[in-house]
Amino acid sequence: MSNADSNPASVIGQTKDLLETVYKRILEHYGIHYQEKANMTKLLSQVNDVLGLTPNKQDRLNSLGLISAKILGNLNQVANGMNELRNQFGRGHGRGHTQEGAVVVPRRYANLAVGSASVLINFLTETVQRVDQCKASEQIDQDFGN
C-alpha cells in the first residue's frame, strides 16, 4: 500500500499476482495439478472445488447454506473483477503513457483491490486450515477404529 499514492496501477497488478500465487500454493498443498498459464478464473475454480467452496456444494436446505452459496458466488466475482481491473489498469502489460489503459487509477481502486484480496486470501487460508483439521481428525478416527 505504500505505493498506492504514487503508483496505484502497480499495487493493483501486485495484488492480482498475490492472489494468483495463493491459488497456486493452495493447489500445490493438496497435490492438485494446474496449468502453469491457467487464468485466474480457472485457478479459483480449482481452489473452490478442492476446498468445497463451490456454491453448488452448499446445503441449500438451510439458511446458512443458501447465504453461503450467495457469498461464495460473490467472492468469485470479486476475484474475476480483480483480474479484469489488473488487465485493464494494472501495469502487468507494460503500457506506455499513450496506450489504452494508461489512465491514472485513483488510489481508492488500489485500496479496493488490496482490501478485497485480503478478505479473500484470509478466507481461503482459514478454509485450508479447517479442511486440514477435518482431514487430520478423520485420520485419527480411522487410526483408532472409530
Locations of the language-model features?
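Charge-enriched, short contiguous segments at helix-coil
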Residues: 68, 72-135
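Amphipathic alpha-helical interface elements
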Residues: 1-73, 77-80, 127-145
